[in-house]
């Protein structure tokens, strides 16, 4: 992986360039972090005005699933680093970019390929690394799903092989619920492939995300892994709605969680932030998934850490020193649009939200309001997690996403 000896000046021949393939809200915060370090940021997405477009040095609109379009953009931009901001970027073109040394793919082309879907990463984690996980099978038809569920036993969980966050997941208590689970998985699949994963249901106590950060250790000159404090989170219908840090874990469970995170991040290689999702039951920890990029639950680090996950990702990509110090307990709560709105939108209640003690609001600037779409996040700190969660939830609740109300004489 390329390690720059110096950082040039953006928009000049000396510039150090990064290309984001995908321009989400996570990419937006990463772009800001990179720009603070003097990096020239290019952001590409399928629609104009995506969150990272609004802050990048240059914005590009193209089909980020089109291999030829990506190749052409890479030729035009000439980036030093290509950072996929989505699991749906074609693996073949990323491998081509890395193999031909056109640019460094973050963290690696292998990591992006294996984590494109649950089948690739779960098989790798189980067969190659021997990580503890629930029993699982894959199915391409409803009949295969029925046989797999029978082998694993009920209750079980059915998931699309490829979906966004937890979309399309179903708890299946018996055979009579399989058809609905199959249909839900196909409906929310990120591809047209009719393939699902069915896994043993573990009555876990809680879920955590471990952010594992891989960069160069200045003491040794070699790549090493650092860990942020564990992040707890809650989902609603598969979507992240709140997170908090630090999540309470026993010492044994935390040691195991960090060991699992280190093993998967090291095996996938490269530099950057890995978001490792784990189930915890007592002191037992089970691998669930890994994201070779920024993690939505990690938005809480905007308030809790000396350097947020975005700062850490930027530093790690460049091979710079890492500091994962926690400075305060904190929590985040998602600001969602409950209903679809056509046309321009605005955010009411910002004054009330920011009057909540130790709280900040981040609005993503998305151009369209869709039902249940994540439009921003409230981040709060406090002396303890319970208080921080209350503050974040209160602040998020004050924000109303609504059609723009023009004042008389306004434009």
UniProtKB/Swiss-Prot annotation:
Pathway membership, UniProt: Purine metabolism; IMP biosynthesis via de novo pathway; N(2)-formyl-N(1)-(5-phospho-D-ribosyl)glycinamide from N(1)-(5-phospho-D-ribosyl)glycinamide (formate route): step 1/1
Domain of life: Bacteria
SUPFAM superfamilies: Glutathione synthetase ATP-binding domain-like, PreATP-grasp domain, Rudiment single hybrid motif
One Pfam family this sequence matches: ATP-grasp
Enzyme Commission numbers on file: 6.3.1.21
Enzyme class, first EC level, given as a word: ligase
Substrates-to-products reaction catalysed: N(1)-(5-phospho-beta-D-ribosyl)glycinamide + formate + ATP = N(2)-formyl-N(1)-(5-phospho-beta-D-ribosyl)glycinamide + ADP + phosphate + H(+)
Binding residues for ATP: 118, 159, 164-169, 199-202, 207
Keywords: ATP-binding, Ligase, Magnesium, Metal-binding, Nucleotide-binding, Purine biosynthesis
PROSITE patterns named in the record: ATP_GRASP
HAMAP family, A to Z: PurT (MF_01643)
Protein name: Formate-dependent phosphoribosylglycinamide formyltransferase
Organism field: Corynebacterium jeikeium (strain K411)
């Amino acid at each position: 992986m390329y390690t720059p000896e110096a950082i040039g000046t953006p928009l000049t021949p000396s510039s150090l360039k990064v290309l984001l393939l995908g321009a989400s809200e996570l990419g937006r915060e990463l772009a800001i972090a990179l720009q603070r370090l003097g990096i020239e940021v290019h952001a590409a997405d399928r629609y104009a005005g995506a969150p990272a477009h609004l802050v990048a040095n240059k914005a590009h609109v193209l089909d980020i699933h089109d291999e030829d379009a990506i190749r052409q953009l890479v030729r035009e931009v000439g980036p030093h680093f290509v950072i996929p901001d989505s699991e749906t970027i074609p693996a073949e073109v990323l491998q081509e970019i890395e193999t031909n040394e056109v640019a460094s793919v973050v963290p690696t082309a292998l990591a992006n390929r294996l984590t494109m879907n649950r089948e690739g990463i779960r098989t790798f984690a189980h067969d190659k690394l021997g990580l503890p996980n629930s029993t699982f099978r894959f199915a391409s038809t409803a009949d295969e799903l029925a046989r797999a569920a029978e082998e694993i036993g009920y209750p079980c969980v059915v998931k699309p092989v490829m979906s966004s966050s937890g979309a399309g997941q179903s708890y299946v208590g018996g055979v009579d619920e399989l058809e609905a689970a199959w249909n839900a998985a196909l409906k929310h699949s990120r591809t047209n492939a009719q393939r699902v994963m069915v896994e043993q249901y573990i009555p876990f106590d809680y879920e955590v995300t471990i952010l594992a950060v891989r960069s160069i250790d200045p003491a040794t000159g070699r790549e090493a892994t650092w860990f942020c404090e564990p992040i707890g989170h809650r989902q609603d219908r598969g979507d992240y709605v709140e997170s908090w840090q630090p999540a309470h874990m026993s010492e044994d469970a935390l040691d195991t969680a960090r060991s699992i995170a280190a093993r998967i991040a090291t095996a996938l290689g490269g530099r950057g932030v890995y978001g490792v999702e784990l189930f915890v039951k007592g002191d037992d920890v089970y691998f669930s998934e890994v994201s070779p990029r920024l993690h939505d639950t990690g938005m809480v680090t905007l308030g809790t850490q000396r350097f947020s996950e975005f700062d850490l990702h930027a530093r790690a990509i460049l091979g710079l020193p890492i500091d994962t110090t926690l400075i305060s307990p904190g929590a985040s709560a998602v600001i969602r649009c409950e209903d679809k709105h056509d046309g321009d939108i605005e955010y009411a209640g910002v004054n009330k939200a920011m009057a909540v003690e130790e709280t900040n609001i981040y609005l993503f600037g998305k151009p369209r309001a869709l039902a249940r779409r994540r439009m921003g996040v409230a981040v709060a700190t406090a002396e303890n997690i319970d208080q921080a969660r209350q503050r974040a939830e209160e602040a998020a609740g004050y924000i109303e996403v609504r059609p723009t109300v023009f004042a008389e004489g306004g434009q």
